[in-house]
Amino acid sequence: MDNMNHEELNDQLLVRREKLHNLREQGIDPFGKRFERTNATNDLLSLYGEFSKEELEEKEISVSIAGRIMTKRGKGKAGFAHIQDLHGQVQIYVRKDAVGDEEYELFKTADLGDLVGIEGKVFKTNVGELSVKATGFTLLTKSLRPLPDKYHGLKDVEQRYRQRYLDLITSMESRETFVTRSKIIREMRRYLDDNGYLEVETPMMHAIAGGASARPFITHHNALDMELYMRIAIELHLKRLIVGGLEKVYEIGRVFRNEGVSTRHNPEFTMIELYEAYADYKDIMKLTENMVAHIAKQVLGTTTIQYGDYEINLEPKWTRLHMVDAIKEHSGADFWNPMSVEEARELAKEHNVEIKDTMEVGHIINEFFEQKVEDKLIQPTFIYGHPVEISPLAKKNDEDPRFTDRFELFIVAREHANAFTELNDPIDQKERFEAQLKEREQGNDEAHMMDDDYIEALEYGMPPTGGLGIGIDRLVMLLTNAPSIRDVLLFPAMRHKQD
């Protein structure tokens, strides 16, 4: 900001503070009291928008509305303004002879951004705009800072994220995104509740970071003098509940991963995890596609959505593709025949797939998938059959134990869900954890820790179980056509602002 703009802004701040002082001198509270509203702006349009000018004059409909002044014009003894609430804007018409000298003076000196209450009659202007003719004007909150330019809103994307309140004031699209987010989560809950699932709450601070491959945030509990980890997944506590006999459970909550920030990643994000006893990953596939289609229908009214340049069809049944078949289809590499790690590394070299020296065959298969296949999966696709090495909590496949009964859901080349037939053999689970510990020793700090308490829970017997995790932020991105995860998080993680 140059010096001239800086001085101009200071002048505006001073003028508004002077108005604040004058209001107090007159005995008017610039940060007023409760105001009774009869209608929101969208109510007025839906209830009275179809009435003619003459019908409204005849009916003399009285309303009481409140909102923020977004535009203002007029001089002398009358003026117009648009006030905005959550749902939109409506025009108000204020005449001195209708509201009186004192209230008209309040209107005249009001600034853009001030919050006001209006009592009046609904009417239509000569050009047909539904409006409210004020009979009363109340200042509810004096705004001490000018809003961003009303014609351009917030052009600085970073400012939109840092000062989300300004973004919400100036962008109806942004407000609609977050209202839609709330509706998506509400419909998800409704769908699961209606299908017999029980919503539960489990700890966010864990003694052991488990349930996913990720770096945790670490904190310290002073009273207990112990390190705790902010949860990287909800999984292991929910599966303990399955052991305890709660047969269908879910939790919607925050998860924390001490990793990079990108258009798809935020260090804290919202997940839903659910588990169902006596089910497997194929049952969870059906649940996933039916639930997402239900949410789209209820919230958007359609299962055909636009995301960027793509038209996406969310109507079940979605494509199901084994990871090895997907790799073969898109790269020609065939991992169906068992091979040594040396042969797998040679195949990676042949196909220009980057790998690390510590990787086993299963890791290399996964690298093939991520580098050769993932970005081609646009329409909803269940990729199943992940290698055992990268799936320490999933049950081995009966027909080919190199792979697991696990799937990931990909839409627009992004992972949206991860699901297993859960591993319920405590001996196998302990061996998997031990293999993960070896990976940690070799430098993989995202490998799973040993969790003896969870092993003990499994030893009491967990029924065959299907489990699912969905990243809610990414689902909201998909259903609102948002290009970045920051567009669907009210307050995304940001670096400290540089002065």
UniProtKB/Swiss-Prot annotation:
Family annotation (InterPro entries): Aa-tRNA-synt_II, aa-tRNA-synth_II, aa-tRNA-synth_II/BPL/LPL, Lys-tRNA-ligase_II, Lys-tRNA-ligase_II_bac/euk, Lys-tRNA-ligase_II_N, Lys-tRNA-synth_II_C, NA-bd_OB-fold
Cofactor(s) required, per the database record: Mg(2+)
Main location: cytoplasm
Cofactor binding mode and count: Binds 3 Mg(2+) ions per subunit.
GO CC terms in record: cytosol
Reaction catalysis annotation: tRNA(Lys) + L-lysine + ATP = L-lysyl-tRNA(Lys) + AMP + diphosphate
Enzyme Commission identifier(s): 6.1.1.6
Binding site for Mg(2+) 1: 408, 415
Binding site for Mg(2+) 2: 415
An example Gene Ontology biological process: lysyl-tRNA aminoacylation
Classification via Gene3D superfamilies: Bira Bifunctional Protein, Domain 2, Nucleic acid-binding proteins
Keyword Metal-binding tagged: yes
Statement: the UniProt record of this protein carries the keyword Protein biosynthesis: yes
UniProt entry keywords in alphabetical sequence: Aminoacyl-tRNA synthetase, ATP-binding, Cytoplasm, Ligase, Magnesium, Metal-binding, Nucleotide-binding, Protein biosynthesis
Subunit structure and binding partners: Homodimer.
Annotated family: Belongs to the class-II aminoacyl-tRNA synthetase family.
Protein name: Lysine--tRNA ligase
Originating organism: Bacillus cereus (strain AH820)
